[in-house]
Amino acid sequence: MGLGRGQSPLLMALLLLLACLQMGMSLERISYVPQLSSATLAGRLTQSTFTLEQPRGQFSHPSISDSDAIWLVVAHSNATQKFTAPQKVEDTPVPADFPQRGYYLTLRASRALYPGGPPSNQLRVLRVGNDTRCSPRTRGCNRPLPGPGPYRVKFLVMSDRGPMAETEWSSETRLQQAEVLQAAPGPQTAGTVVIIAILSVLLAVLLAALLALLIFTWYDTCGSTPISGPGELVFVRKYDTHHMSRPSTVGGS
């Protein structure tokens, strides 16, 4: 009994250390780097989305089952070092946590959706940020990305007991940016400003003169043209010419 009492603190420490080591070793590393889709694919990069190749055949390890969830971790490039895999599904970060944490989980799937084997003719890609209707507080929501990045992603396998395996982080991905129209290079001199002002005034005077000319022409045309009313009548005098008059009868025969 005395021996057991003296060894109990040491035994508890060893068990705690063993549990920590087991948790640290349970996360299997998958030597796969997520890749962007082919450069020939339309919409590969937009202002709020990007497209990945599906990780086909990368989750065939015996420790991974068909019921395990495969998440895509989306992170700011400078937040990958502080990423911590959630221990429970309830602790999964959502897009609403992105500004504070710098990462979230989305596009939940299973390994049955990423089978191995030869590639087929079907287009198999993952479009990140493609769902505009889901709430950013919904677990697994695939909301449009909030800025140009850069972003990095990886796949995380989770079971009911916690995280099981993860892939490598991808390289940095930068989204397209809206082009902003810029003025001509170089400062505008005072002479340029004066010339622009004079041309603007001359254009206004020319338009005013043209408008006045049109109005004057319209009034002049309407005032000089006689317009007969519908009630005016035209009388034509009837007369006979002398050579058309009938000769009178002279005497009886």
Curated annotation (Swiss-Prot):
Q: What is its main location?
A: membrane
Intracellular or extracellular location(s): Membrane
Per the UniProt topology annotation, the Extracellular ranges are 27-194
What membrane topology does the annotation report for this chain?
Single-pass type I membrane protein
> Signal peptide position in this chain?
1-26
> Source organism's superkingdom?
Eukaryota
Print the keywords alphabetically: Glycoprotein, Membrane, Signal, Transmembrane, Transmembrane helix
- Alphabetized InterPro entries for the sequence: Uroplakin-3
Q: Where are the transmembrane segments?
A: 195-215
Q: Could you name the Gene Ontology cellular component terms for this entry? A: membrane
| Glycosylation sites recorded in the entry for this protein | 78, 130
Q: Which residues lie on this side of the membrane: Cytoplasmic?
A: 216-253
What PANTHER family does this protein map onto?
UROPLAKIN III, UROPLAKIN-3B-LIKE PROTEIN 1-RELATED
Provide the family line.
Answer: Belongs to the uroplakin-3 family.
Q: What is this protein called?
A: Uroplakin-3b-like protein 1
Native source organism of the sequence: Bos taurus (Bovine)
